[in-house]
């Protein structure tokens, strides 16, 4: 451990500057205007993998943005760890809410503020620097492969094809991902599962054009009003989702599982204070931990229609739109939930409007085994680095590739994230603690060490 700490201390300035350089690339995969920047980011990542000691580094072309592959095979008889991450980021909007430019990393109070600081540039780059550390100190105990994609934030639409076409190249014993969070740096945790996702857009159309609200208001259905009513009807008075069949396949936690989940440290007042809300909201009968990790949800991600510019324009809009995401739990299937939503949405629509539902992307929920060699290696690594055992938690987010790895490669994933829920992922002023960045670089080599040792027992 001291060797690791010494190397990080000696090179921490350069390691931070390299991360800053990565964060300056506006690699927004959702917006075509950033295409050149996304491609430049891919080349930068490939260059840094080569500099760190990776071999057979390749910028692999896809129908979308490239996937970066690299490896270091020290001994074919040794176990292999496949590291996954993504170099694309969410759009920075709304820009006016950022205190500093989103693609000019700024340090305040020991935290790096930039889009992608935590999700996922800061976290995947820890693995690149941890790999460099092991190479430079001659302590790499197992084989390592990297697969860093550029389309995670838009559903990883080309990753499945790449994995299917490269099964031999991607052959490994475990996948290691840092794209999740810890409870806190005082209470380290390991995520034992992720929710799935169904993401779609709905369109409600009324008249064939925007109308004068004085001339036609009261006689013609307003699509914005209809859409708002339809969305509101999808939760009952207990905040239970009302789509028929939505909960049919949900596996309820046992009382023992619920008790274990809710034993994690949690300060509700601090939680509310951080979010600046007076009261929490959610499905009745479940705790915050359960609602955000083990229960399915339906959320409106965006809603618009009519005139939203400066000043006033008295129109009755022709159309209204919403983007909706549903987080899923084990046994629910993304495509099935999308179909249930679509059927219900069309059924509850009045005859005065027309409905269109467009699926975007989805992913399946996963649960990772806590009795595996890889999970035990992560436990030991975190305990040595932090001085205490990690608390098992269930993550509320979705990483569709995890289920894909299991289905196509037959391997499980370890979710060893170093972010915090308060890091404002997908929001203005995203941040990542510098302490967490260095702590990750120190902890990751320990995972490889213990994974290699436990694999030989």
Language-model region placement:
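Flexible glycine/proline-rich, aromatic-decorated loop/lid segments
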Residues: 189-205, 414
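An extended, acidic, His-containing surface patch that forms the Zn2+-binding/catalytic region
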Residues: 51, 184-185, 242-319, 330-343, ...
